[in-house]
Regions:
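Short glycine-rich anion-binding loops that position phosphate/pyrophosphate groups of nucleotides
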Residues: 218-219, 371
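Redox-cofactor binding/interface segments in oxidoreductases and associated redox assembly factors
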Residues: 49, 214, 321
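Active-site-proximal cap/loop segments of hydrolase catalytic domains
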Residues: 247-454
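Peripheral, non-catalytic segments that deliver or gate enzyme domains
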Residues: 1-208, 219-241, 281-285
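Conserved beta-strand elements of the Class I
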Residues: 211-213, 364
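A structured, mid-to-C-terminal "fold-capping" secondary-structure block
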Residues: 214-215, 272
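The conserved beta1-alpha1 loop
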Residues: 215-217, 367
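A fold-wide structural signal in alpha/beta-hydrolase
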Residues: 211, 239-249, 390
């Protein structure tokens, strides 16, 4: 699910040239997806990334780089790696972002006009480029943080520390749940991170709490240590209702370099799920999460993971599945980014629908009727296969819910759906004191390192 994301997931649609756009038609036979794919040099030249005809291909697989002179002369600089975007000038040279070859699931990198990877081996992930009068500024996702670097000859120079934009200004008078950083190890020893957000006014000493695990989209996305509020069930929204939230960053996401991102290629939902489950086990073991009041929620790839999780275990009492894939072969055939989906999982063995008879968890399935990224048939298939599920389809909505009334309705349904977890509390529930055994039979013993966040 190749959506372009903010703190959760933003609407992704196949790029189309805007009608009358000033840069449309710069390169005959090709199209420019957006203004962000054109960079202007002070002397009037333009660096342009083009894609093939949007009517036959979204273009992510075969972009090309060009220089267009002021008189309209086009110089072709050759094909660029998949998903090329955001060209900027660096003196008389051009650099841009693209996927690290040769796979379609992996980390973004910075390339020069000769298509050489300038960030190979970097243990973080470039997410944006900004043209300046000198060296370009590279926005870098590094773990839970975001940093700004200057692109230099053979090295990056960091120009800021962690950058956290203030997204909560309109809510300064609203009490928020305490947010903490969580670091732990996967069963195979891989270092992982994530966030824990507690109910408003509570500390970990007040636990165990009902816990909702929020799985991010992508999978090439992440939870950053910033304000967690969105139009889907989100951590601060849940904190207002007495829930703790676990926001894991499993392998496959951004912020940890190319190898970390590429680890789920052809193995979607495998080690990725164990990364998530291990974090839940540790939160139960530390008395933060009530093992009898666990829920899971996600949108897009997170929706797939929520559906996949309840085929792996019966520990969840509620699962919110938003715009998620349930059948990978059908998604590859009917979705608009089939080649990218095939790089993640291409068989029924990766599909929740194959194991739907195992699902005992109640499901709330939500989808946009006009979603072309993940067609609504994915939701309909899962709903038809699971009797204890509710399906909500919003007419006219795409891969993101954009209409205010629909957002309110979605959150109201989610609120009532997850409220059932409060009713499951045992009168004498006590925190677990030993590591919990997950559905796979593993016992996880690595220590948890809790770090206080500056978010609130």
């Amino acid at each position: 699910m190749r959506e372009l994301t903010d703190e959760m997931v933003a609407d992704w649609t196949t790029p189309r040239p805007a009608s009358g756009a000033p840069d449309h038609g710069l390169v005959p036979g090709r199209h420019v997806a957006s203004a962000a794919d054109v960079a202007r040099h002070p002397d009037g030249r333009r660096a342009v990334i083009t894609w093939s005809s949007p009517e036959i291909d979204p273009g992510l697989l075969n972009p090309a780089l060009h220089v267009v002179a002021p008189d309209g002369t086009v110089t072709d600089l050759g094909p660029a790696p998949a998903d090329a975007r955001t060209p900027v000038w660096w003196g008389d040279r051009i650099v841009y972002l693209a996927l690290t070859p040769p796979h379609l699931q992996g980390g973004m990198a910075v390339f020069d006009q000769d298509h050489r990877n300038l960030t190979e081996g970097m243990p973080a992930c470039p997410t944006d480029l900004v043209q300046t009068g000198g060296a370009p500024v590279v926005v870098v996702a590094t773990g839970l943080d975001t940093e700004f670097h200057l692109l230099g000859e053979g090295a990056f120079a960091r120009v800021t520390g962690s950058h956290r934009p203030d997204r909560r200004a309109p809510l300064t008078d609203v009490p928020l749940g305490h947010q903490e950083r969580l670091r732990y190890r996967a069963p195979d020893g891989l270092d992982l991170d994530g966030l824990l957000v507690l109910p408003v006014g509570r500390t970990r000493a007040d636990g165990p709490f009902p816990l909702i695990t929020l799985v991010h989209g992508g999978p090439y996305d992440r939870w950053a240590d910033d304000f967690q509020l969105s139009w889907v069930p989100s951590a601060q929204w849940l904190a207002q209702q007495g829930f703790a939230s676990f926001l894991p960053n499993p392998r496959g996401g951004l912020g940890r370099g190319h190898a970390f991102a590429a680890a789920v290629a052809g193995r979607v939902g495998q080690e990725e799920w164990h990364d998530i489950e291990t974090g839940i086990d540790l939160l139960v073991a530390h008395g933060v999460a009530d093992p009898d009041r666990l829920g899971i929620s996600g949108w897009s790839h997170g929706g797939f993971m929520a559906a996949w999780a309840v085929t792996r275990t019966d520990r969840f009492r509620a699962a919110f599945v938003g715009a998620g894939i349930s059948d990978w072969p059908k998604q590859i055939a009917h979705g608009e980014c089939g080649a990218f989906e095939a790089a993640l999982g291409d068989s029924a063995e990766h599909s929740p629908i194959t194991f739907a008879d195992r699902i005992t968890t109640p499901l709330l399935i939500v989808h946009g009727a006009a979603d072309t990224n993940v067609p609504v048939e994915q939701a309909e298939l899962l709903h038809a296969a699971v009797a204890h599920s509710e399906l909500v389809v919003y007419p006219g909505e795409g891969h993101a819910i954009t209409q205010r009334a629909n957002k309110i309705d979605l959150l109201d349904r989610a609120r009532r759906f997850f409220a059932t977890l409060h009713d499951l509390r045992k009168p004498c529930a006590t925190p677990a004191t030993t590591p919990q055994t997950g559905a796979s039979g593993r016992i996880d013993t690595p220590p948890v390192s809790w770090q206080r966040s500056d978010t609130n």
